[in-house]
A protein has these predicted regions:
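Contiguous N-terminal and early-domain "leader" segments and peripheral loops that mark the onset or edge
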Residues: 25-27, 32-50, 212, 216, ...
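Catalytic binding pocket for nucleotide-activated donors in carbohydrate/polymer assembly enzymes
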Residues: 69, 73-197, 201-214, 218-239
């Protein structure tokens, strides 16, 4: 699929417009047997172990409105999602985005615009059935008081399912295992990871998973300094605020 990036920059940047540049879910590509889909992931320690208490129905964070990006620390950002029953997310420059994983990991139901338009092999490992169910719950309850018994029962059960799925399938270690399994390297005990010094979500997250799995037997060349606690650089500039 060819997308003219200059043309895309000249037109209104909305999910619906961008979607038109992507493959329809009804026309999915059949990839060669040695090409596999992949997704982002999230460190297991970032995933809540229980459903958090909710204080409001919808998060004030709007993905396409940077004036709502008001949080300067990870804790403040995560607490916004923990306090919210639903959080808005959508396709922007691409389908995959850390926000989807951060929502699920913090016990916030993604209200995912146009998720039904996502191609089968894109965000392949995400629980699209649960995401569609989350949209249905939003439409069912968005005008309901946050203390409503039926709302809490049904939505909290759904959040538990999202947390369980994220912990089982979407951790950095789980995706690292997926890469090793698909490339027939499940039995290796040492890794040489050749990447880039610059932060990149997919590359860095896979490296994190391999580091968790192999420890000092995973060597990154060049060294990705931003993932190490011993480094003291300003990491506040490496995320997409």
């Amino acid at each position: 699929v060819y997308i003219d990036l200059f043309l895309m920059s000249q037109i209104l940047f909305t999910p619906k417009v961008i979607i038109r540049g992507y493959i329809s879910p009804k026309n999915n590509i059949q990839y060669p047997k040695n090409v596999f889909p992949i997704t982002f992931s999230i460190p297991e320690e970032k995933i809540l172990t229980s459903v958090p208490i909710k204080k409001k129905m919808m998060s004030t964070l709007i993905p396409w409105n940077k004036s709502t990006y008001i949080f300067n620390t990870e804790d403040a950002y995560y607490n916004e999602y923990r306090n919210s029953m639903f959080g808005l997310t959508c396709l922007k420059a691409g389908w995959d985005c850390m926000r989807h994983y951060e929502l699920m990991a913090n016990g916030c139901i993604p209200y995912f615009l146009d998720i039904q338009e996502c191609p089968k092999n894109t965000m392949f490992l995400l629980p699209k059935d649960l995401l569609i169910k989350g949209n249905e719950l939003y439409f069912k309850y968005h005008n309901t008081d946050i203390t409503n018994t039926y709302l809490l029962s049904e939505c909290n059960h759904h959040i538990k399912n999202l947390l369980d799925y994220t912990r089982q399938h979407l951790t950095t270690k789980a995706i690292a295992n997926y890469v090793l399994q698909k490339t027939n390297h499940e039995d290796v005990n040492k890794i040489l990871y050749i990447g880039t010094e610059q932060p990149d979500y997919l590359s860095t997250l896979i490296l994190h998973g391999l580091k968790i799995k192999f420890g000092t037997n995973c060597h990154d060349i060049p060294r990705q300094n931003h993932i190490y606690k011993t480094e003291h650089g300003d990491i506040s500039k490496i995320w997409g605020k």
